Design a protein with these regions (language model features):
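Conserved SGNH/GDSL esterase-like catalytic core that processes O-acyl groups on lipids
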Residues: 22-125, 135, 164
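Catalytic His-Asp segment of secreted/periplasmic serine-dependent ester chemistry enzymes
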Residues: 145-223
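N-terminal cap/lid segment of alpha/beta-hydrolase-fold proteins
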Residues: 239-289
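Short beta-strand element of the alpha/beta-hydrolase
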Residues: 276, 288-299, 310
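Short beta-strand/loop motif that positions the catalytic acidic residue
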Residues: 459, 465-467
Length: 617
């Protein structure tokens, strides 16, 4: 059995973090770190990481014995406490070494110099680091054990109140998260006979065995239940991003009543940042006459567009559009599609990362484009909600292309929206024609952290997709698979549909406007077309709901042949006779069709599409 100790490398990282931190950070008289990593070349069992202090170091061997043949157990034990930046570096380094299936965290006795508020803040940050560094690991959080008065041990020491306070903070924070609580405070701490009479903190041999059994039992139960992490791959501190950021007006860039500003953005690698926005509120909107609002997210190569904001303001909505590449449209004329398109100036103090640079995926999640952009979108949303006259209960989000990708992630993370409307944008990036042949650890890591297929199931609001059959960027097959993951959805699949990143209002599908008017202004719902039912003799029945809208036409869109790139596939359209009785259409599958779907178009050009179906042929 091969075993190695990573203490040297982690001690170096810890020492570096120690040297870079402020002297005001509370420190122990003796600082130490101890790492144990067995079975590094074995992958036949789940891998468990114990993170903690000297108590964890005490019971580590017993946990290994109890889980022998069931899991490999590794340990990061350290004197650093929550609140100490050095601990952040130690945990990140450990998570970079291995992929862990379960992480058991037990750290609360150290750091007496930190207030409860500081502990709570550090808890959020540590949780984010663990979630980002091990997105699919199952997380167990142990309550901190009490401290007893030595040598009699029957009396609890005053320091126990700190354990109680911190345990309450943990329980409150973890209440809505997919985290198992291992109550060591009760199962171990309630037994004075488990403590050594030297200091009233550490355990004797009986206590060590009991703690090891409790920890191993909790881990074993999680393994036996086949528990999987059902949350998001990456953690954002929404409490922080739900606060309205500071704003610096940029009146020289105001356009036709649409205002320009720099907003304070997410901290990036320890630095403060800013990002550019255009925003507007219709005239007459105030606290007595609030208006609904939209968050607008551009695609790759784009920036914040005043014209997009104005389109919505003219329809009676407040709106905000942010730059998600650290840029702003200095020097660009009113038409953003002139030859300078994509030639945007950089925002001083902005985050200048590329949405398509997958090589960054090996960095910590909070140093990657998707994390920073989602955080800034939340801040832009919070700023919009703070504006006088904006109805915070009536806000939707839409985005085109990469903005559609961001729309899906935003809707999963930010629970304040009422609907989401991605124009293109979907999951299963590894199945895109565009990324065929993409390999490597960075690519695999990007898929783990950011592929929308991990997020769509966590979206609790309706999703309205608008897309095309032959898009070069977002392939039709992955789009269909993504739609199937949604809890509640609308879809409009045109053949073909021009790809746009949102700068041109013509790129905003009619369905997005109609859905916003439905949810926020009492307009009719969108039509829906349900999955086709195969009948005998090659016939198909498709049911649909018009939502009170007049049907203009019903079409079957089909493709002949299979294989090859989705963008190269040929699609044909046959218009079907309108049925005498509305709500169901029956037709024969076109000869030679290998795949088809049905579109119902209602007045105003509102399209509703069925899921696609592969035929037996």
């Amino acid at each position: 059995m091969k075993k190695i100790i990573l203490t040297t490398i982690l001690f170096a990282v810890s020492a570096l973090a120690f040297a870079q931190t402020e002297r005001s950070i509370p420190r122990e008289d003796i600082e130490w770190i101890d790492v144990w990593g067995p079975h590094n070349n074995d992958n036949d069992l789940p891998r468990v990481l114990l993170i903690g202090d000297s108590i964890t170091r005490q019971y580590n061997a017993g946990v290994e014995q109890n889980l022998d043949g069931k899991a490999y157990v590794e340990r990061l034990s350290t004197s650093k406490s929550l609140g100490d930046p050095a601990l952040f570096g130690e945990i990140r380094t450990m998570l970079e070494q291995y992929d862990f299936d379960i992480i058991h965290f037990n750290n609360g006795l150290h750091g007496a110099g930190y207030t409860n508020e500081q502990y709570a803040s550090a808890l959020r940050e540590i949780y984010g680091i663990v979630r980002s560094g091990a997105p699919h690991a199952k997380l167990i959080w142990a309550t901190t054990t009490p401290v007893r008065v030595a040598p009699q041990m029957s009396e609890l020491a005053p320091a126990t109140q700190r354990s109680i306070d911190r345990n309450n903070i943990v329980r409150e924070f973890m209440a809505d998260k997919d985290v198992v609580i291992n109550d060591l405070f009760e199962s171990v701490g309630s037994h004075p006979e488990y403590y050594t009479d030297v200091d009233g903190v550490h355990l004797n041999q009986t206590g060590i065995a009991a703690a090891a059994k409790a920890v191993a039992g909790c881990i074993s139960e999680v393994l036996d239940n086949g528990r999987t992490y059902s949350g998001l791959p990456v953690y954002w501190d929404t409490d922080k991003f739900y606060q309205a950021p500071g704003a610096t007006p940029m009146p020289k860039l105001d356009k036709y009543g649409i205002k320009a500003a720099l907003l304070d953005g997410v901290d990036f690698m320890g630095d403060k940042t800013q990002f550019f926005v255009y925003y507007g509120v219709p005239e007459g909107a105030d606290a007595d006459h609030p208006v609904p609002a939209m968050v607008l997210i551009h695609g790759g190569g784009g920036t914040a567009y005043w014209s997009w904001v104005k389109t919505w303001v003219d329809r009676g909505y407040a709106a905000i559009a942010m730059s998600n590449n650290g840029q702003f449209p200095v020097g660009i004329e009113d038409n953003p599609y002139e030859k300078e398109w994509g030639n945007w100036a950089l925002v001083p103090g902005g985050i200048h990362l590329d949405c398509g640079d997958f090589g960054h995926a090996l960095r910590p999640a909070e140093e990657q484009w998707a994390y920073c952009t989602i955080a800034d979108i939340m801040l832009a949303h919070s700023f919009l909600r703070s504006l006088p006259g904006v109805d915070t209960e009536r806000i939707g989000v839409t985005g085109n292309s990469w903005g559609g990708f961001l729309t899906l992630l935003s809707a999963a993370v930010d629970k304040r929206y009422k609907f989401a409307a991605p124009v293109y944008g979907c999951g299963f990036y590894d199945e895109f024609d565009l990324h065929a042949g993409q390999t490597g650890k960075a690519w695999e890591r990007w898929l783990e952290l950011w592929d929308p297929s991990h997020y769509i199931g966590n979206i609790d609001i309706p999703i309205s997709w608008a897309c095309g059959t032959n898009d070069f960027y977002f392939s039709f097959g992955p789009l269909q698979k993504s739609m199937a993951l949604a809890k509640e959805k609308y879809s409009a699949v045109r053949s073909p549909m021009i790809h746009t990143d949102g700068a041109d209002p013509a790129g905003q599908p009619a369905e997005t406007f109609a859905l916003a008017d439905h949810f926020f202004k009492g307009g009719p719902d969108l039509p829906k077309v349900f999955a086709p039912t195969m009948l005998k003799n090659g016939k198909v029945a498709v049911e649909y709901c018009t939502a009170g809208r007049k049907v203009e036409k019903i079409e079957v869109i089909f493709s002949k042949g299979e294989g090859g790139r989705w963008e190269d596939r040929k699609w044909e359209t046959h218009e079907l006779p309108l049925p005498k009785k509305e709500g169901k259409v029956t037709f024969k599958v076109p000869e030679g069709a290998s795949m088809f779907y049905v579109n119902v178009t209602t007045e105003g050009g509102i399209v509703a599409s069925s899921p696609s179906i592969k035929t037996a042929s």
